[in-house]
Design a protein with these regions (language model features):
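Structured, active/binding-site neighborhoods that engage oxygen-rich ligands
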Residues: 1-315
Length: 315
């Protein structure tokens, strides 16, 4: 995730497509700094370590209020709704013009990693999380991504992985339609830039952080990358828009599909173990070891598995 973000962050928010170089030299020159999605994940991870696999939504909100200071996009509107004693899903909908932005998508892959091989459980976690500050496509795209992250522990075929994620959300929702259109367009044209153009023509909005566009660009990057880590994250960066999020998500999914040994040698050798939390994290240590975080995530995955999956019908 961090390696993907390192490619996408310099061009994040640029709405023109461009050819982006691959391996970022910055990986070996300084500790990785987390973006907003990883900031949330660091806080969610700490909260889940304390509360266990059956963590309540109220406990996530409490951790947010104590440790997250993000004040842009959807976040201040959700905070204001917490202050009005509005629980989810109302907190994600009421007076929130960014309810379908990509904030929950940017953090959703964590839920797949703590529910490995159990996409329905990952979807359950992701839905509860996303509804805190989103609704509609902002929730559905997050569920799709979480389901793919979970399935990627066992499913290595990119097309089938995308379909497994789609099976967790309504087939007629905008996120699902956009992803299926991308699959079809890419199959017809086999060109990432042509497919990107068609996606933006059909689904783009004024908000560069739109979750539907983000889902479509993630799907496009996976398809165009054909299982190659560098090609996939470079495609996401070349597409622009919300490339900080889309490159990070694409990097996560390819990392799960390929495993550490399947990543390019030059990327693995350059990546540093240190992760520095972004400015939005407050009241927690700003420095972390990527290896320790991975171990903690794996341990939570074991706890979730032992606790038993939440029946899909409860959604």
């Amino acid at each position: 995730k961090v390696m993907g973000a390192a490619v996408g962050r310099p061009v994040d928010g640029q709405k023109q497509s461009q050819e982006v170089a691959g391996y970022p030299a910055a990986l070996s020159q300084a500790p990785a700094v987390s973006g907003e999605g990883t900031d949330f994940q660091l806080v969610w991870l700490r909260a889940m370590q304390g509360a266990g696999p059956e963590i309540a939504t109220d406990e996530l909100i409490s951790a947010w209020l104590r440790h997250l200071g993000h004040v842009h996009g959807e976040y201040p509107y959700a905070r204001a709704n917490f202050g009005r004693d509005m629980p989810p899903p109302v907190s994600g909908v009421f007076d929130n013009p960014f309810r379908e932005a990509l904030g929950a998508v940017a953090r959703a892959d964590l839920w797949g990693m703590v529910a490995p091989g159990d996409p329905e459980q990952a979807a359950w976690f992701a839905r509860r999380d996303a509804m805190i500050d989103h609704s509609g496509a902002g929730v559905e795209a997050a569920i799709w991504l979480a389901g793919m992250a979970s399935a990627a522990f066992a499913e290595k075929d990119i097309s089938r992985l995308i379909e497994q994620g789609l099976g967790l959300i309504p087939s007629d929702c905008r996120a699902a339609r956009a992803v299926r259109d991308v699959v079809r367009w890419h199959g017809e044209h086999a060109s990432w830039d042509r497919t990107r153009e068609m996606l933006l023509r059909s689904y783009s909005s004024e908000d560069g952080r739109d979750s539907v566009v983000a889902a479509g660009l993630i799907a496009l990057s996976l398809l165009n990358g054909r299982g190659d880590f560098e090609r996939s994250v470079v495609t996401a960066a070349s597409c622009g828009w919300s490339s900080g999020c889309t490159c990070a998500a694409t990097g996560t999914l390819l990392g799960l599909v390929l495993g550490v040994e399947g990543l390019p040698d030059e990327w693995r050798s350059a990546a540093r173990d240190q992760l520095v939390a972004g400015w939005g994290v407050v009241g927690l240590s700003r420095n972390a070891s990527s290896g320790v975080l991975a171990d903690q995530t794996c341990e939570l995955g074991r706890l979730v598995a032992r606790a038993g999956a939440t029946p899909w019908e409860e959604l």
